[in-house]
Amino acid sequence: MPAIFRSVNTDLSKVDRLLYLVNSTYFFGIGKNTIWDTSWGDEVTEENPPMTESSVVSLPDIKLYKSPIYQTLAVESQCGTVDFDSCGNSEGSKKLTLINLETTSRETLNIISPSYLYFKIEIESGDLTFANIENFRVAGLYKDTTFNNPGQIRYLPTSVVNQGTLYWASYFTPIQKNNIITTTYVQEIIIKA
């Protein structure tokens, strides 16, 4: 699951860039409710979805956009509060501590020098009902997506004014609605900045 990190103004300090990014508006897009087939590659099947390329700029057939329930900065630590086996970066397993931005001073941020953006998204069966789909096979994190009626937590693609910039993308085997009726599909995304 590659992170697709787009450029940000480099005249800003590292902490300023991270604060700009974490305070931006993000939406998690899900879609592709049709099967994976060989039109995506000779070896592609439902059980063997295509690899996500870092050059991808948009996702196919988005059916729903939903805002993250939590987004913050994170820093590597030996006593991390969150352990990610697969963070979507090439550095492998990391222990990270999530930073409470409401209680952490700017001076402390400069000292601890966070290097990660953290997002948590939850997709429930009601979200799939809202989007009128039974499953999905792609997901992506978009920055600065704009909609006709701002202020909602989820949108259909017909409400999109500007899709924004794709920062993270993943293709996978189908997530079925009947599998998330009693549980919630949770996606945690770490992007090294």
Locate predicted features:
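Small cysteine-rich, disulfide-bonded extracellular modules of the LU/uPAR three-finger superfamily
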Residues: 1-136, 144-193
